[in-house]
């Protein structure tokens, strides 16, 4: 399902959890490249957000968890999100939108175990999104485990984060060591 094994990274960091909860911003296709389809099949519950009507229609026909058809920059996340989520995906186009949404989330009332954030550094003319998102998530207590995920080892487009209070410390330590040596996402799947 996932483009570069994001779903497997989530499962690795959460020790194969089968009853998790996710929030997905930028769902796109319900299966192709989906970071939550496998999680849903494993019993996870969650909610997705997507702006494209044709993707929302497919999603509603093919997936069981709900989807919100909306411009993600126009949502009131204080009304939608509360408590703990095991996984957060932020993947909107262009990357300036992803950063704007990241900063809109209710960080005082929500926690996330694992976050995949698409910064599209390879296409970011300003070269600011990756640094700003990293500074922001670090300030919230998140740890960057897998920086600069790239499907082709060249086009860095995404960072993978965890909150140390919500993942196994041994797995976190092993992943941090491995991340120093790996660019390919496949190398991060060590523990399942």
Each predicted region: which residue ranges?
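SAM cofactor-binding core of SAM-dependent methyltransferases
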Residues: 1-78
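Conserved acidic-Pro-Pro-aromatic motif
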Residues: 36-45, 65, 83-90, 94-191
